[in-house]
Amino acid sequence: MSSVWGRILGDLRNPLFRQGYALMANTVVTGVLGMGYWLLAAHHYSPEEFGRGQAVITAMRLFASLTALGFVGALARFLPVAGRRTPELVLRGYGLAAATGGVAALGFLLTLPMWGKTYSVLSGFWPGLFFLGSVLVWAVFTLQDVVLTGLRRAPFVPMNNLVFGVVKMGLLVALAGALPSGGIFVSWVIPTALALIPVNWLIFGVVVPRHVKESDAAQEPPRLREIGRFLAGDFPGTLSILGIVYLVPVVVATQVGEATFGRFSMAHTLASMIELLAMNMAVSLTVEGSFDRARLAENCRHALRRAFLIVTPIIVVAILAAPLILTVFGSSFAEEGTTLLRLMSLAVLPRVLIEVYLSALRAQSRARMLATVQIGLAVLVLVSTVVLFPYAGVNAVGYGLLFSELLMGLLIFGNLRKILRGGETGTQAVTQESAGAS
């Protein structure tokens, strides 16, 4: 036991693992509190309101994330080396994410009748305005965690989300009697807005000034043109991946009833949390690859080993215990969601390879390959899901993910192996592309 504890302490001295473990801890915290939140929602609200709340929150996160998550790779890549331009980069990210998400949400509200009766709850001026405001809030909320990670302050992320999750659950229960219709969505948005105040005080009052002070004054911050070239490849690809995460559930919501969507969404959410564990170590890899490019191959090997070591037993448990896990929410959840949870959990294994490869590409600023891999994966998932949906129902999402990620994992494996060995697409390519960018 002491040797295991000693190894963990040793890992925490390595910023790659410290950041990665903090983000994984955040996933566990949000996962446990998220399960508790939806368990309370299932018991305090009607099945129709449960499904409607899931659908509206999913739509809100989709529009808020259109640009916000598109900037995750860019912020993780350039914040470590932004120097005196760090505050400007953060504020530009916030502004662009909020503006783009707001425009998309406005378009959604103007075409509301096209999206089915599930979203009719948003019709009217005040419900629409509240939804629009929630999109702006969630866009900033999404990016503030990325900012903390990019500035090597990821341990603050799970602390913030722990408080946020507890407050959200308390408000959910409090509103069950006062606001039986809409209480789920309101209880999600209000704590999110309140969380922006202390976290951004920490970012702009403490973390950013310290980062600027510790930066090498002689180092030239990245130019907007360099960041733009990176985004030209990474943003379309990331936007495509968002189609897998958020657009697929929205499309499913238009095809099934509210109660059925609620059961689908619970299995989908749980499996997505396992996938986040793999993605968290990959984000840390991008940050450390930007801080220390010479160790990219070594850090890739470390990230790959740790990610598989952590997610494999979780996947095994999810596959074996899927019915038991979902029964907590009700027998109908287990009946309709077990196969989906198993398929999506299994798909995380090839996703580990894909995420580590994408993080290495971001550290190398290889924008064209980033776009190719991400857009290709999104097309595979979306097409296979649409083709299989008439035959497999909501389980088509799981079959589509598993098939697509296995295929993409095979396609990128050769290039990933070269990076792991420090070959021509690894450290040498970093140096060459860095020189080209300057």
Residues covered by each model-derived region:
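Interhelical loop/hinge segments that connect adjacent transmembrane helices in multipass membrane
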Residues: 2-15, 160, 177, 182-188, ...
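Signature of the first transmembrane helix
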Residues: 3, 14-72, 232-258, 382-386, ...
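Transmembrane helical elements of multi-pass membrane transporters/channels
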Residues: 18-34, 157, 161-168, 184-207, ...
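Membrane-water interface segments that mark the loop-to-transmembrane alpha-helix transition
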Residues: 18-30, 56-113, 122, 126, ...
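Helix-loop junctions and terminal segments of transmembrane helices
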Residues: 39, 67-84, 150, 267, ...
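Interfacial segments at transmembrane-helix termini and the short loops linking adjacent helices
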Residues: 47, 112-131, 258, 320-352, ...
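Hydrophobic alpha-helical transmembrane segments
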Residues: 125-129, 158-209, 380, 394-419
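Membrane-interface junctions at transmembrane-helix termini in multi-pass inner-membrane proteins
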Residues: 136-160, 291, 346-375
